[in-house]
Structure formats: structure tokens, C-alpha cells
Amino acid sequence: YLIMSVFLIGYCACDNDEENFDTATTGQVIKVPDDIKSFNSVTKEIVFEKNISIKQDVLGNEKVEFRIAGNGHFTVGSISSISSVIYNAPVLLGDYQRYYLYDGYPVVDVLQNEVRNQEERDENMQKIEKAWSNFLKVLNEAGKLK
């Protein structure tokens, strides 16, 4: 028991506040544009069709994959607005029955090192840049982009 206790204490002490979604599991697949009612490119609010339910996790262990009608896909972490962890990767934020697609969470303005966090977010968005452009294009063509 002593060895296990030391291991658990060490593991918890080494926890980093910045979350990496590479180890998360894909919990939901969203078909673009079919499963999306609208996406506001200014506020980043995304409204899903009625039958869509998104599982959220404050630790970022859930992922949502957006499959874009024959034009690729991208995956984001699905988190709740009550999360206190810094995410510098694209996220689907659930906030009281509303959802938002952000480049990270929380907004960089409230973080100590704004520049470093924004640079990391920009790098992660570049990784999905082609799929993100297709996402916006498909939604626009379907009349679902605001």
C-alpha cells in the first residue's frame, strides 16, 4: 500500500494544468452539415439539430469528431464551462445548453502568459486549417453559416 500511495501522490503532484487531447477518446461524431443547424463565425456558437447530445468532461477526456461531407475531418476536445484546466487546443465548449467552437479555453486574456498560450493555440489551429476551411465552406454552402 505504501508504494501505491507514493505513486498516486507523485502522479497527482505532476499533473499539468494544460490539457492535451491526444489521449482522449472520440465519443461523438458530428456530420457536417447534416447535424448542424447553424454556426456563428463571430461568436463561435454552434447549434446542433435536435437529436444531437454532446457528452462533456471537465478533464477533457471526451472528443468530438467533425466529419465534413467528403472533405475531411477534425477532432476537438469536448469540455464543460466549469472546467478550470487550460486547453490550448480546439475545443467544443458546453455552456448551459449552448455550445461554442473555440481555439482553446479559457480566453487568453485571463491567462498569465497570453502570448505563449495564443501561440500554442495558433499552432494547433494550423494543424486543422484545411479541415476548418472546409467546415466553414460546407456550412456556408448549406446556408448554415452566420
Model-predicted segments: where are they?
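Residue-level hotspots at or immediately adjacent to binding/recognition sites across diverse folds
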Residues: G70
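A short, polar/charged loop-to-alpha-helix boundary motif
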Residues: I82-D95
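Bacterial Sec-dependent N-terminal signal peptides
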Residues: I9-T23
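Short, Lys/Arg-enriched, disordered terminal segments
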Residues: Y1, D15, A142-K146
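Bacterial N-terminal signal peptides
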Residues: Y1-G10
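Intrinsic disorder and flexible/low-complexity segments
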Residues: F21-R67, V76-S80
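C-terminal partner/receptor-binding element of secreted or periplasmic proteins
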Residues: L93-K146
